[in-house]
């Protein structure tokens, strides 16, 4: 489990990215790089770190499900992830 402060910081940063997304797109189309530099650097979607949506864990992130490998395993064993089956080869 990540610290509460890290989870809150990540949520605030995602809100900031959404807030400036439209403006960033317009400025990029116009090639107004001076205007882009006036926008906060944290508003860039490149700076986002993928975190587990359940507990905020930053590592072992599975993009398709938006959770970490640990939570993926727990939910898969409980049968709470549709379309996921245990396999062996």
Swiss-Prot record:
GO molecular function per UniProt: rRNA binding; structural constituent of ribosome
Function field: Binds 16S rRNA, required for the assembly of 30S particles and may also be responsible for determining the conformation of the 16S rRNA at the A site.
Keywords of the record: Ribonucleoprotein, Ribosomal protein, RNA-binding, rRNA-binding
InterPro entries per the UniProt record, alphabetical: Ribosomal_uS14, Ribosomal_uS14_bac/plastid, Ribosomal_uS14_sf
Source organism superkingdom: Bacteria
Gene Ontology terms: cellular component: cytoplasm; small ribosomal subunit
This protein's name: Small ribosomal subunit protein uS14
Pfam families: Ribosomal_S14 (PF00253)
Biological source species: Onion yellows phytoplasma (strain OY-M)
GO terms under biological process: translation
Family annotation (PANTHER family): 30S RIBOSOMAL PROTEIN S14 (PTHR19836), SMALL RIBOSOMAL SUBUNIT PROTEIN US14M (PTHR19836:SF19)
Keyword Repeat: no
Family statement drawn from the similarity comment of this UniProt entry: Belongs to the universal ribosomal protein uS14 family.
Assembly and interaction partners: Part of the 30S ribosomal subunit. Contacts proteins S3 and S10.
């Amino acid at each position: 489990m990540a610290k509460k402060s890290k989870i809150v910081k990540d949520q605030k940063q995602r809100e900031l990215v959404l807030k400036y997304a439209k403006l960033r797109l317009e400025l990029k189309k116009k090639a107004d790089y001076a205007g882009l530099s006036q926008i906060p650097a944290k508003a860039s979607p490149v700076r986002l770190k993928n975190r587990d949506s359940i507990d905020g864990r930053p590592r072992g992130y599975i993009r398709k499900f938006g959770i970490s490998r640990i939570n993926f395993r727990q939910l898969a064993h409980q049968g709470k992830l549709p379309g996921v089956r245990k396999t062996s080869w």
